[in-house]
Amino acid sequence: MVGLSRLADGGLLLVLALLPLALDGKPAPLEKAPMAPARIIPYLRPVGKESRAALDRMVPPEDGDSRRLEGLAKEALGEGCFGNRIDRIGDVSGMGCNRRTPAPKAPLRILPYLRPIRKE
């Protein structure tokens, strides 16, 4: 009987490597993965005119003419940074992306605090 110390020296790797071999020296047959023809069939259908036009809009042009994609890119861009609306930063402080009106200059923001308080 082989001791565990011998198997730990590298014999274990040899046993694990030879494990899939059958007694006659041929590799054990591997199980085949089941095919799912229902998922493959829709992709084999011919492309119609409407779907071909949709695919043409999604695929970038090969000749370098990107004017067709400019309209789609502008539509996808939202009111905030990277298409996401930013309420606190963009609206309140004016520090967000895609601002429509520039932020007021610093002196205009400070003036209301510099006015003397009237006591009546």
From Swiss-Prot:
Disulfide partners: 81-97
Range of residues in the leader sequence: 1-25
InterPro entries the record matches: C_natriurtcpep, Natr_peptide, Natr_peptide_CS
Expression sites by tissue: Expressed by the venom gland.
Entry keyword annotation includes Disulfide bond: yes
A single cellular component GO annotation: extracellular region
A GO biological-process term: regulation of blood pressure
GO molecular function: hormone activity; toxin activity
Keywords: Disulfide bond, Hypotensive agent, Secreted, Signal, Toxin, Vasoactive, Vasodilator
SMART domains, per database record: NAT_PEP
Prodomain residues: 26-70, 110-120
Subcellular location: Secreted
Reported function: Natriuretic peptide that dose-dependently induces the rapid relaxation of rat aortic strips phenylephrine-precontracted. Acts by stimulating cGMP production in a dose-dependent manner (by probably activating NPR1 and/or NPR2). May also show potent hypotensive effects.
Family membership: Belongs to the natriuretic peptide family.
Protein name according to UniProt: Natriuretic peptide
